[in-house]
Amino acid sequence: MKPFTTDQQSPAGSPESAAFDAVPGDGTTAPAKGRYARILELAGPAFFSVAFLARLPLAMLTIGALTLVTSITGSYAQGGFAAGAVGIGSAVGGPALGYLADRIGQRPVLLGAAVANPLLIIGTILTAAQLPGGGPLAAVLAAAFGMGATGPQVGPLARVRWMAMTSKDRTGKELGTALSYESMADELSFVLGPALVGLLAAAVAPWLPLALAAVLSASMVSAFAFHRSAAVVLPAPRRTKNTLPEPEDTVQRGGTSWGLLALPVLGMVAMGTFFGATQASLAAFGGTFGAADAAGLLYSIMGISSAVAALSVAFWPRRFSQSARWAVSAAAMTAAALLLLLPSGIPGMLAVLFLLGIPVGPTMVSIFGIGAELAPRHLMGTFMTLLASGTVAGTAVGSGLAGPLAEAFGHPAAFLVSAGAAASLLVLGIASAAAVRRAKNQTA
């Protein structure tokens, strides 16, 4: 693999064609090879392991807070509030971290998060430990908010790096493959994260998952910050002013309205609401069998099928547009989510969750793909973190809605929140398809 250089312009075909000066390689055409082999060559093997481990803490924080507080207090509602505080913090802090990364570079922002986030995780554990003795829930919620606000935004910032590393490919296939991989990595992290929370909480102690998240945040996020791919993305003041034509199937960014940009953000909020409601509902479902701590393990089954399906999106035909993929996948999600109301035992629930995961991955890939096409170049990091924060904020909404419903009426009522969130995704997907088509017609 050739070293990264800093003297090249980004060609057309990349959502970041005018935003980056540093891209890999020397301008020669790469030999034909498998799509995933090509992105492995672009980033280097270490990128994948480091970036995956670095994103695990964010996948553990919400359900870790839910599990910790629920285990200590016995209240699904209080656990849902703690998870909600994490999500709200991430909704506020995530885009702020992305904006800072756009302005001053990814490395200093990630290193700051690698210091602050572990400290606030420890604060959450310590304040939660005081709850049985009459400690204030407000202190736990404040610490959880800070924990979410400083959560390392590894997934979104990795996507920004990919937009630079694949900027020579005019076909967009390399970026599409990279985004499919990133969605798969996100899904696997949200499989392994909750699974680790469930295993460690059930086998050792409910505080241990968050303690592990603190260790990973301090170590692996720092490693991601120092990975050489960080040099690919230059801060906004140092970016080139040159612009090149967009791919023919991309909406012109200069004419992209904020209303159109809001659709993928709202889509990720709905996706997060689906995730949060499903997590909280599964905790209540497991509780009927005396296994509330196993919610993460149950949830991980959906993530496995979702991750595999996300990888397949790289091979879908390009004429099947991102907006159409979103609408079709969300329709399948809505139908499958209604099946959550049927199982009366764990084997049946596992089967439904596996089926439900199949359209989840492609929906996420499609929404991020639309975001990559539409986002302003100089705010790409901000917009990618905004999408990811939408997921976490939605998780807070879903947990906050489903937790009290589960406590008052049982898990079937809580699963209705999951089904409603999937239906919202369908509506937003249809709206996005219509809006993107209208925008393309106006700029044609």
Question: What are these language model-derived features?
Answer:
Residues 76-77, 169-183, 292-293, 377-387:
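Loop-to-transmembrane helix entry/capping segments in MFS-fold secondary transporters
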Residues 93-106, 201, 308-323, 406:
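Helix-to-loop junctions at the C-terminal end of transmembrane segments
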Residues 65, 152-168, 282, 362-375:
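Intracellular juxtamembrane helix-capping segments at the cytosolic ends
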Residues 115-135, 225, 332-344:
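C-terminal ends and interior cores of transmembrane alpha-helices
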Residues 378-409:
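A late C-terminal transmembrane helix in Major Facilitator Superfamily
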Residues 143-188:
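Cytoplasmic helix-loop-helix junction between adjacent transmembrane helices
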Residues 324-367:
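C-terminal transmembrane helical hairpin of 12-TM major facilitator-type secondary transporters
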Residues 25-91, 251, 255-300:
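Helix-loop boundary and gating motifs at the non-cytosolic
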